Amino acid sequence: MTDQPAPTDHLIRAADEVKIRQRLVRVALGHVAGDTRLRVGKLLDVHSRMWLSDQEIILSGRRIAYVGPAGSYPGGVAHEVHEPDLMAVPGFGEVHKHIESSHVTPEWEAALVLPHGNTWTCEASHEFSNVNGPHNLEFWLTARLAGSPQKIFPLPGSAVPPTAYEWGGGHFGYDEQAGFLNESLMVAGLDEVMDWPAVWNPENPSYDRLWGMIEATFEKRGVIEGHAAGIRDMATINAFAAAGLASDHEAWTTEEVLDKLRRGLFMELRPHSLSEMVKGLLEAGLEDWGQFALTTDDRSCSDTLKMGATDHNVRLAISAGLSPEVAIQMVTINPARHMRLTPWVGSLAPGRFADIVLLDDLPSVSIRQVWADGELVAEDGTYLKPIPKIDWPDWATQTVKIDRAMMADDFAIPAKRGRDTMHAALLRPFHWDDDFITMDLPVKDGQVQRDPRRNVTKFAIVDRFSGEGKTSAMFWLGTGPRTSDTALACSMGHDKHNVWAVGSSDAAMAMAVNALRDIQGGWALVREGQLVATVRYEVGGLMTCRPPAELDAEMQALYAEGEKIDWMYEPTVSPRWFPGFPERLAFATLTCAPWRWVLVAPSDRAPDGFVNVATGQTHPVVW
């Protein structure tokens, strides 16, 4: 048998996999020399949760060919690396992450998180999917094909669109999901099913679309990720599990976690509640953590630069009382098993990608080196590899399609003739009540006015897909600027990602939205009639193709300008809603459960944009 060169091994392809593994067999037997012998002081076998002393890992191409006691390998190698003082653990994985929330493109995301041990990510891709659904898979695989060592396993978004009352950018059903799963083995399944009321209501206009995507995923035995926010009663938890929705990352209490765990859900713990959850579960006597993973979900590059990536989540779990070994299992073998990716990632074992994290201290998860694809890619927190140069095409960079200048009149809310006041429907950020708030607001010059004395300002959604700039506007309570002629606008508005704006004057709102149109997305801040800060997200209106430090500098400048503004604030049910610069308004535009009344861009089913997504009922914003 002649020795044939292995395939490039960037993406998982069945035919290539056979050739790769045929070669790995020969390397493991010593018939063909390995590329590198990496000898370490200790190695964590995550299958048994046992430490093995003085081990060698034989690397061949991008994979592991052999693991065993030092000196046991029967063949030769081209290179020798000996790290007797370091401990080897598998590359860390993200079971559920929106890379878009880092706001850097995948090639820069790799440079950002690989020094923190994050070698693979299951990308919950409904953000970019909602901007450009047809190019979704191409977008997520481009960086890997260009040479990035990070593995991205996309899960096409079920929330495309998030509800039947939103449109533009992408529309996924059975045909699209079947196509993605047939196109690439990198596709791990179906991204979080968020509109769960539609799953068990045949009258909901999203019912057939969602079940079509579920069917297509079952056909390929893919994983169907869940999003069970607001589900706490036993009947609904059972219905959620019965639908085949396999996981949840939205639990807020220990009791809720246990109720969902006992119905078979895979539980994904997020950092903001992780410590409390781990402590509560330990107090409850939980011993088997095999049905748990740690997940980031959303984290900006600014926060990653400050606190870390997956390694930060592991440290939180350890500080809450978990052993380091269990915490590491929760970012390696556990998520790999759940996502059915164990032949490729999740452990230091033959056939897997040669993704290895070398620690010099276990309790603090101090990372000395990170190996990926069989090469050293990061050391002492520094990324060592060149960044692939990707010239993102127009389908990725020309996505804020507003083909005219927005005017103050676009944000006006007219009053009925002869009225001094109008009844107005209001929302707060993260308003999950069954009904909206009602107030009487003053009328001036034929338009309904804000009332800053009562913490009332104006909020708007601008369609960025049709080119027409169709706008819906209403009054919101407890957010936005009190400073005159001031507005904030952003093109990341989960999950449809139309442009949103909040402002103390219609003219300032128009100025901020026009600035976003000019830079093709990001943030724009107008203070007292002047544009004072912008942050550019030119890729999808969600990300930038620039170094994370450069983006962070722009964000810090935005925050600094934001500190000069008097921001309204009232608490809501969300524990993650804080006073000051209202960055989390980007999440306050969500339309999935437990939201009821929401504001969306004008659509056929919601012509004025104000709709109850649970019932389909619409209502005027003033009357």
Swiss-Prot record:
Its EC number is 3.5.4.2. InterPro entries: Adenine_deam (IPR006679), Adenine_deam_C (IPR026912), Amidohydro-rel (IPR006680), Metal-dep_hydrolase_composite (IPR011059), Metal_Hydrolase (IPR032466). Belongs to the metallo-dependent hydrolases superfamily. Adenine deaminase family. Its cofactor is Mn(2+). PANTHER family: ADENINE DEAMINASE, N-ACETYLGLUCOSAMINE-6-PHOSPHATE DEACETYLASE. It catalyses: adenine + H2O + H(+) = hypoxanthine + NH4(+). Keywords: Hydrolase, Manganese. Pfam families: Adenine_deam_C, Amidohydro_1. GO terms for biological process: adenine catabolic process. HAMAP family: Adenine_deamin (MF_01518). Gene3D superfamilies: Metal-dependent hydrolases, Urease, subunit C, domain 1. GO terms for molecular function: adenine deaminase activity. This is Adenine deaminase 2. It comes from the Bacteria. The lineage of its organism: Bacteria, Pseudomonadati, Pseudomonadota, Alphaproteobacteria, Rhodobacterales. It comes from Jannaschia sp. (strain CCS1).
